[in-house]
């Protein structure tokens, strides 16, 4: 709708259902969906009554950047909006720059700078008002090529009215580098955890450790991992069931890249952005991307990038897209239009348009074409002004629910400079999957006696795991299963050559240790991973 609440659609003749949806929890839709019939060259008028349930600001913030080019100035764009039902007084935004980015200037200027944190005073945001912040920063010339840089932003006030106070635990995750170790800390900022949950540690693109944790209110748990040379570390810690999205995601996430450098001073890159960063809180956001030496100036980026060449993601992962454009012609562009045909596997009802480099408006045409209109834009050509010739716009969208594994989601955008033919971006695509991250859990850690073959499958497992031992050892054999705290979970007798099935009856997900002993002594030991 426009500022007066009026809306219009251009439709082909036919029957339609018209309803309203909002991500803002301050409205009550008091009427059922409207059924309308439109004839050719006809106009239908429909009112959509709604009731305001809370008069309160609903402040959101988003961040995007065309690129973090190596050894040159970067443009960072922040969009702060009040989508609530009441003006937002004393509004401010904090932006924390990556350690490798040095602040150069901004419009508007910050009212304070504390290290890498910039504070901007927005005074009062009216209902449905948005304010842009444009920051210029310089990338450190000594940073590794391809390193990931993150910009975080938070808007205040950040209260969401009408929500039930959360009375459960609230886990926060942090990551630091301490000499030769990556140190994760899990802090419970809520009530005592009633049950244990699991945390998972990733090293680059494999799962390195899964272990349980349970924290009382205010308790902090430190997890220290010896840093492998060049590796990227990430931790995911489960929140309690029904954890509200306005407080964060169902997992707490932290990561650290390049704690222990390679001999050449570099480190493994590209692993942070292939996973979801965890940004569901409306008043907070984090934007991460790798620095580049050269890049396609007109493309469509997706975050997370997805795992491996198939860009695997888990079902129900929120998707953040950034469309980048640059005027590489020989004259100023005065209008840019972007048309992005949204895949039917994405839910347009969940669309959230984010930050952009220039003022724009957007609409949806022909059912599923998302259109961004920058008119006027006055975009100089790259020969006249390399920095100012770039632009970008971002949006978030959710997957359709419960897509089956193997589903591929792909789409691309067309970028129109003035009245020239469109530049078509490469496809951005994902594949839905599960259990695609390999685990550093060997089926057999050690086979102590030779000539004995121990088979354990599947591993990881969910409901049951199979054991089979073949070899010269004489039975019976004893299988002992313990958790990581050394508590015995199960003990069974096995026979050489026979297959044994171990059922996971009400076990907690996580890593378990097994040992097989025979008359001659220990035969083998290993790890099992029970998945949720």
Language model features: what each stretch is:
Residues 446-457, 461-532:
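C-terminal outer-membrane/trafficking sorting elements
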Residues 1-445:
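Exported/extracytosolic protein signature
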